[in-house]
From Swiss-Prot:
Belongs to the CobD/CbiB family. One of its GO terms (cellular component) is plasma membrane. InterPro entries: Cobalamin_biosynth_CobD/CbiB. GO terms for molecular function: ABC-type vitamin B12 transporter activity; threonine-phosphate decarboxylase activity. This is Cobalamin biosynthesis protein CobD. Keywords: Cell membrane, Cobalamin biosynthesis, Membrane, Transmembrane, Transmembrane helix. The keyword Metal-binding does not apply. Its main location: membrane. One of its GO terms (biological process) is cobalamin biosynthetic process. Pfam families: CobD_Cbib (PF03186). The lineage of its organism: Bacteria, Bacillati, Cyanobacteriota, Cyanophyceae, Synechococcales.
Length: 342
């Protein structure tokens, strides 16, 4: 997306974003290749453990936390930009292909659906031990003693949070990158994924990450705030009862300490007519989260399937609307240039 012929801009934008969405939907992340986020996670783990061992002072750890966060995010975006830049020197087509693959790797829609489906199958067979084992692969809470309802709740909550963190937020930044051809969609999308990975690895309010991870946690909250609200707003419209669902979200979303996860879970609770939140155990420690939604309907396996449908649908609509807005902006800019030449 670097040196793009303005006349080809709409086509290239559609090819990159549309191709990325299709690639994630059909293939997801092949197990045979190392995902970019895994590499980012390895670097974060090495650097954070080194800082924890070498730095004991509270203020120094906070400063190192800022440095770590900015270094990982900027380096991730720059490396993606450099790869595309060098690829374009070889062939513009190669650069587009790399961007398609790179942006697709930032979308977690396919892997999210697979993870949820891996829990659905044993639940249908009444095999709770296997369902707990599958659930433990993608949630942080203790799963050993969860009841069927708690497994269902944890799965829907994971779909809700990861729809925002792993699907629509990367899409938002990829679309934003399209607006700046010299940057491109992949660098911004992978930079956001780096911020999200930092938050998930060091953004804890417990030692030894309290001081080291504060910056990463706060930054990820800010970066996700707008994409989260846009997703919630669109889900409310897709539900067919926007006024009712929005009222529930406005009531319950702010109850959660997180400025984003409460909203993402509250909208799913509202549109599915269920109740989320409650008591969870993390490494044996009880953590009580606020109850979200009115719980008009029971939590069932069908609710997981419905949550996945909403996840896919809101992604598709945001992709289509985002591209429409971007292409309209580009068309307006081109018209103004043409007018000035007259």
């Amino acid at each position: 997306m670097m040196a793009v012929d303005p006349n080809l801009f709409p086509l290239i934008a559609v090819i990159i974003l549309g191709g990325s969405a299709l690639l994630d939907f059909l293939l997801g992340d092949p197990k045979s290749w190392r995902h970019p986020v895994e590499f980012i996670g390895s670097v974060i783990n090495f650097a954070s453990q080194l800082i924890i061992r070498k730095v004991n002072d509270k203020n120094s750890r906070r400063l190192w936390g800022i440095f770590l966060g900015l270094k990982i995010i900027i380096s991730s975006g720059f490396l993606a930009w450099l790869i595309v830049y060098l690829a374009e020197k070889v062939s513009p087509v190669l650069a587009v292909i790399i961007q398609i693959i790179g942006v697709a790797s930032c979308f977690a829609g396919h892997s999210l659906a697979q993870a949820a489906q891996s829990v659905i199958e044993p639940l249908k067979a009444g095999d709770l031990p296997t369902a707990r084992q599958k659930l433990a692969l993608f949630v942080g809470r203790d799963t050993n003693n969860l009841s069927e309802r708690e497994i269902l709740r944890a799965t829907v909550e994971s779909v809700a949070e990861n729809t925002v963190d792993g699907v629509t937020s990367p899409l938002f930044y990829a679309l934003l990158g399209i607006l700046f051809p010299f940057v491109g969609p992949w660098p911004l999308a992978i930079a956001y994924k780096a911020a999200s990975t930092l938050d998930s690895m060091v953004g804890y309010k417990r030692e030894p990450y309290t001081d080291l991870g504060w910056f990463s946690a706060r930054l990820e909250d800010y970066l996700t705030w707008l994409p989260c609200r846009l997703t919630v707003f669109m889900l409310a419209i897709l539900s067919g009862k926007p006024k009712q669902t929005w009222a529930i979200v406005r009531r319950d979303g702010p109850l959660d300490p997180s400025p984003n996860s409460g909203w993402s879970e509250a909208i799913y609770a509202a549109i599915l007519g269920i109740q989320l939140g409650g008591d969870n155990y993390y490494q044996g420690v009880l953590k009580s989260k606020p109850l979200l939604g009115d719980g008009i309907q029971p939590l069932t396996i069908a609710k997981i399937a419905q949550s996945l449908w909403y996840s896919r649908t809101v992604f598709l609509w945001q992709l289509l609307l985002g591209l429409t807005v971007i292409l309209a902006i580009q068309a307006g800019a081109m018209s103004e240039i043409s007018f000035n030449k007259i």
